[in-house]
Swiss-Prot record:
One of its GO terms (molecular function) is G protein-coupled receptor activity. This is Taste receptor type 2 member 10. Pfam families: TAS2R. Disulfide bonds: none annotated. InterPro entries: TAS2R (IPR007960). Coiled coil: none annotated. Belongs to the G-protein coupled receptor T2R family. Glycans are attached at residues 92, 158. It comes from Gorilla gorilla gorilla.
């Protein structure tokens, strides 16, 4: 029975990885075509970076998970766990700061506040976003340097060999330190999400006072952005839960089923949010519909040739 359940989990994880690569690859491809036509916008640049970083993150999640499931002893020899930790931090942090940039972009473009600083930033969104991306990148690099020091100190402490039988509390503390930068970016995204909710509530109250009874384009934009940001927050919480399960399984290696469940939960975030972005972005949605129409036409042609 366990073998069957394990097989189901492995199938689900592989399917998530395939969907994740296809979804994020589609986002990246559409925006790269726009870049070739010199039509790449700020949002297009952010989505391209987010797609590439998430493809990288998916491969790290799958590689790390399968090594822990099928060849856990490999971690005990050499520096593999150190290299995977570095790659995971790069993929995780780059994915988060692109996602945070996307949240800030939605906030500046859609939200309505009378605050002078907000209005100044809103009028210069296309100038502010590049500086914001650079700021997030620099903070990621500084955090990465701190992470490298943590990993190096821990490695030296254990005589250049990673001790898999470390105290659980010490291992969890190390993982919390590794995720400090990600938690900071996620907090920024949550703050922008809360401000968008406040802006939507105030806008709806103004619309009700006008007694129009119709949803204007501003309300639609608010709702669409809220769906993307709330789904991001929910999926990222699931991602964190999955990571916590995987970390706990790292210290207790007997429970493979729990590890597979954690890996399945973790992989939902990078592939699920990509499809939400496709459905929430009019350009990506239209491009996906055109692709589906082309696939249907190809299928009809094949059927006609067979008959």
């Amino acid at each position: 029975m366990l073998r069957v359940v394990e097989g189901i989990f492995i199938f689900v994880v592989i399917s998530e990885x395939v969907f994740g690569v296809l979804g994020n690859g589609f986002i990246g491809l559409v925006n790269c075509i726009d870049c070739a036509k010199n039509k790449l916008s700020t949002i297009g640049f952010i989505l391209t970076g987010l797609a590439i970083s998430r493809i990288f993150l998916i491969w790290i999640i799958i590689t790390d998970g399968f090594i822990q499931i099928f060849s856990p002893d490999i971690y005990a020899s050499g520096n593999l766990i150190e290299y995977i930790s570095y790659f995971w931090v790069i993929g995780n942090q780059s994915s988060m700061w692109f996602a945070t940039s996307l949240s800030i972009f939605y906030f500046l473009k859609i939200a309505n506040f009378s605050n002078y600083i907000f209005l100044w930033l809103k009028s210069r969104t296309n100038m502010v976003l590049p500086f914001m991306i650079v700021f997030l990148l620099i903070s990621s690099l500084l955090n990465f340097a701190h992470i490298a020091k943590i990993l190096n100190d821990y490695k030296m402490k254990n005589d250049t060999v990673w001790d898999l039988n470390m105290y659980k509390s010490e291992y969890f503390i190390k993982q919390i330190l590794l995720n400090l930068g990600v938690i900071f970016f996620f907090t920024l995204s949550l703050i922008t999400c809360v401000f968008l909710i406040i802006s939507l509530w105030r806008h709806n109250r103004q619309m009700q006072s006008n007694v129009t009874g119709l949803r204007d384009s501003n309300t639609e934009a608010h709702v669409k952005a809220m769906k993307v940001l709330i789904s991001f927050x929910i999926l990222f919480i699931l991602y964190f839960i999955g990571m916590a399960i995987e970390i706990s399984c790292f210290t207790v290696r007997e429970n493979k089923l729990l590890l597979m469940f954690g890996m399945t939960t973790t992989a939902i975030y990078p592939w699920g949010h990509s499809f939400i972005l496709i459905l929430g972005n009019s350009k990506l949605k239209q491009a996906s519909l055109r692709v589906l129409q082309q696939l249907k036409c190809c299928e009809k042609r094949k059927n006609l040739r067979v008959t």
